[in-house]
Amino acid sequence: MARELKEVQGIIFKRQKYKEADLLAKIITKQSGIITLIVKGAMRPKSKLSAATLNFSAGTYVIYTSGHGLSNLRTYKKVQQFDALYRDLTKNAYVSFIFDLIDHAFVEYQPLGQYYNLAVFALEKISAGVDSEMITQIVQMKMLSAYGVKPELSHCVICGKEKGIFDYSIKLGGVICSDHFNVVESRLHLKPKETAILRTIGLLPIERLGTIKVSEESKRATRKAIDRIYRETIDLNLKTKKFLDELKLF
């Protein structure tokens, strides 16, 4: 495919030095997926492109691309900065992990569809001060389908029951009702309200998830469960997740 100028709307989420005065920046876009951009001269003093490619800058960018490999950033039209993320290390760590999680689920230039909307949702909510932990857990639950391990949350994986008391089984790939608790050794032994949280954040569309109020105890339990689901089904070992976990210890 011949190289062409293309206008994309997206969010810069990772950058590193490239050669003496240039940067490599990763941008997540809805239609064109994740793209690695060469940003010429971005390391030079007073470079306008440097400011427009700070992490978590969202806007419209004009790129020179062939649809594969490295593309070049030519200019930008309108860019929004999420200042709250620069002032708060914890918020920044949460958002960095979320974008890293999305990045590892797709190859470059693969359209993201609903997962782009999920990234925007997380960025805006965490920047606005909504519970970072719960927003991250929402993203983690919804990203399981992108990794090919979508859990069954709508009904019991054994009998199909949709209402009642439920627990979660990683081995069976979803929720099980109380009728089968005594025969499923692999269940996580979550409290009913904790399983209900996993079901709610996994099933409800993001636009229907309003103000999230969950106790610290429940958040710790659901975080532990989600981390175990990822560890036993995907095992990503992301540096951003390790940093986030270390940050929570302080």
Curated annotation (Swiss-Prot):
GO terms for cellular component: bacterial nucleoid. The keyword DNA repair applies. Keywords: DNA damage, DNA recombination, DNA repair. GO terms for biological process: DNA recombination; double-strand break repair. Pfam families: RecO_C, RecO_N. Involved in DNA repair and RecF pathway recombination. Belongs to the RecO family. This is DNA repair protein RecO.
